[in-house]
């Protein structure tokens, strides 16, 4: 934190200096390299920042792609500030906020449709509800280090593979849209291993 102080103040704290850490909250995301974890750091200038123990290059590329997708559209896709420091990085803390008007809700869903399109193009397949934060009229995807999908099923032997085969070329594949399943994987596995 000390070595990145000036950049953090400039890029993540809108120029407001800090001298102390008030709080550190861990266990925010999946553990990375040898148990390293994501931390939310609360600073004495009123800002919170997110520490990630890995390169944020993928996140940077994703944000650049969102800029490209937004060109020529009525609205832009929401982004957040990233400070990639090589083997680790810092991010703006994205705080949830409500919409207050019907017009804001409409703009939110327009942008949400843009996100669905962008992630369909990337073949994204592992977004969870925790990855999507509503910031007023702007939906923002966070935690995107695994955003590019490379799991492809061309032949289905298991029920899981059959499901993937059916939805992998669909906007449902990203996980952004609700997908109601009448079959539980756990239930299927229990029957597959049961002896009769």
Tell where the protein language model's regions lie, with residue ranges.
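Conserved ATP-binding subdomain of kinase catalytic cores across diverse folds
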Residues: 2-122
